[in-house]
């Protein structure tokens, strides 16, 4: 009886191990398929003239909106922008994910930020520097982590030619992802936000995202 129980236990354990291996294989295959779906999008971002033209068009429209914006007496003009895929181009990181069949991982992302190898979205530097030299102030409201991703972000943006990227201009993620509270912090400093630029509805506050 004891021998039978041992054999049954061993058989059950073997089945569990085999099932675990099969699950891991399926998971790896699913990740590979998911990452391959990003290839066309990456090619478009990195190689198409249309992407560049649309990006410049968006920033030209933002510049016009900034120039025509009026603020209440005593208020200062502010522009709020997201960073990733709005100001900074992280398509090389996405390409690495495809090549290695890797899903998003927070630790890998932090290593990418620390590597200081981001590119720039077409038109972003010109718009940023125009606002900061024409009576406005740029604020960078991003869900990059405030604790360990700010230094790499600032260094990268300085390298890419952005002006006005001092520490106080950054409102990165400390605990919560929604950005409305950070927008309010900016407004409490006497600013009126006249333009928002982003690639996600959360970049425009609760009125739109909620």
Regions found by a protein language model. Give the residues of each.
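Sec-exported extracytoplasmic/periplasmic mature domains
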Residues: 67, 71, 92-93, 129-137, ...
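Structural recognition of the beta-strand scaffold that forms the well-ordered cores
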Residues: 78-81, 88-89, 137-142, 169-172, ...
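C-terminal cap/substrate-recognition subdomain and adjoining C-terminal extension
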Residues: 23-35, 49, 145-210
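Substrate-recognition element of Asp-dependent hydrolases with the DxDx(T/V) motif
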Residues: 85, 124-157, 199
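Non-catalytic pre-domain segments flanking phosphatase-related domains
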Residues: 2-10, 14, 19-81
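Second-shell loop/turn segments in exported
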Residues: 44-53, 110-118, 139-146, 171-173
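Stable alpha-helical elements in mature extracytoplasmic
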Residues: 54-62, 120-123, 127, 149, ...
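Active-site neighborhood of HAD-like aspartate-dependent phosphohydrolases
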Residues: 72-78, 87-118
């Amino acid at each position: 009886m004891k021998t039978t129980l041992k054999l049954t236990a061993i058989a059950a354990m073997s089945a569990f191990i085999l099932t675990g291996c099969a699950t891991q294989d399926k998971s790896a295959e699913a990740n590979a398929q998911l990452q391959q779906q990003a290839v066309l999008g990456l090619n478009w971002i990195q190689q198409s003239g249309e992407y560049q033209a649309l990006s410049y068009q968006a920033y030209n429209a933002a510049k016009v909106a900034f120039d025509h914006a009026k603020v209440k007496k005593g208020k200062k003009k502010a522009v709020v922008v997201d960073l990733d895929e709005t100001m900074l181009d992280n398509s090389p990181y996405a390409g690495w994910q495809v090549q290695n069949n890797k899903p998003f991982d927070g630790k890998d992302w932090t290593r990418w930020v620390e590597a200081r190898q981001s590119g720039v979205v077409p038109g972003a530097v010109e718009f940023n520097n125009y606002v900061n030299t024409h009576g406005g102030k740029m604020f960078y409201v991003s869900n990059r982590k405030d604790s360990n991703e700010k230094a790499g972000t600032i260094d990268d943006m300085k390298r890419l030619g952005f002006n006005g990227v001092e520490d106080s201009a950054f409102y990165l993620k400390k605990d919560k992802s929604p950005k409305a509270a950070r927008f309010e912090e900016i407004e409490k400093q006497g600013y009126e936000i006249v333009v928002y630029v982003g690639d996600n509805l959360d970049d425009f506050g609760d009125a739109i995202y909620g």
